[in-house]
Amino acid sequence: MPAARTVARSDARGRGRHTLMRGPRTRRTVAVIGAGLAGLRCASVLQAAGYAVTVFEQAPAPGGRMRALAGQQWHCDHGAQYFTARDPDFMSAVGAWVANDCAAPWLARLASWDGSTLQPSRGTLQRFVGVPDMAAPAHALAVGLDLRTETRIDALQRTEHGWALRGAGLPEAVPAELLVLALPAPQAAALLETAASDLARVAARVRMQPAWAVVARFTAPVEAGYDGLFVNAGALRWIARNSSKPGRVGAETWLLHATAAWSHAHRDATPAEVIDQLLPELPALGLPAPLACEALFWEAASTESPAVADACVWEAASAAGLCGDWLAGGKVEGAWCSGTALAQRICAYDAGGRD
């Protein structure tokens, strides 16, 4: 391996300096850890370019924070709530998702709350959601990929020919020539700490914020005067009527997201304690007492500003890279652009750029 350690980055729009998607001269193996949108996008581009790609995901299904909670006759998006599209490549992808009925525009009535006044939002930004839930685009992107769910990678080891991956669900070490980590920054830093310290330091510089999510179920439709509410006072920061999104069926469900500060202060609380403390916020926001609630804690829900301003990071010396929304401004579109950018860096590296 080269003695110099070069950490190369691409711009935050996800295009990078190299846009030619030329594959390797031989069919090289790539291990992608994390099946959120960034990992799936990176994997799909690399596979189309001729790489042999395997994606490892510790959860039962792909999607990352594009996920929904479900029970008997109800379900609710409890992570990412919607996405927008500005990047031309991502706009094209969203158009394809809409054409294939796995996404649709969300014509939501949005408002904001400052603690005393409910103010309707009059913006024209178009928002999209997955159909029948936010995980649908990730499931569509995973089609045709070698995806190993319920497989947690616990250890990485450098080898003469690349990498060896070990973890729960793997009877033996899995070899790979190239490595992609599509994980939240703290997880990536911990996994790379001894195997690729330069990459680990990049991830360790990023601080991510937690969020408590509460799914509230009601016996009948609730008319609060809005479908999505940006809350600028109190413990909550966002409320959404999940049932207002296209393709949703079942019981009336609403999603509550707590602020990062409140979530951090209550990170050790039980779900029942969180529900008890957040429900008193609802009457002022026009919501009645729910029939039942579920609560879930997101350890890394968003990136604390300032975030790393690069769409991806590639370390040629270790043949490993990082991608994720936290590298490209956050949000669903950022995840897509980051995955694209890293795939481009890898293709350029194998095409002879070696940076």
Functional labels for PLM-detected ranges:
Residues 82-86, 118-140, 268-274:
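Short beta-strand to alpha-helix junction loop
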Residues 28-55:
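N-terminal Rossmann-like FAD-binding beta1-loop-alpha1 element of flavoenzymes
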Residues 47-71:
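Glycine-rich FAD pyrophosphate-binding loop
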Residues 282-318:
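Flavin (FAD/FMN) cofactor-binding core of flavoprotein oxidoreductases
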Residues 63, 71, 176-226, 288:
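Central helical "cap/lid" subdomain
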Residues 215-267, 273, 277-286:
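Active-site substrate-recognition segment that forms the wall
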Residues 149-163:
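A conserved short coil-to-beta-strand element within the FAD-binding core of flavoproteins
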Residues 68-110:
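N-terminal FAD cofactor-binding segment of flavoenzymes
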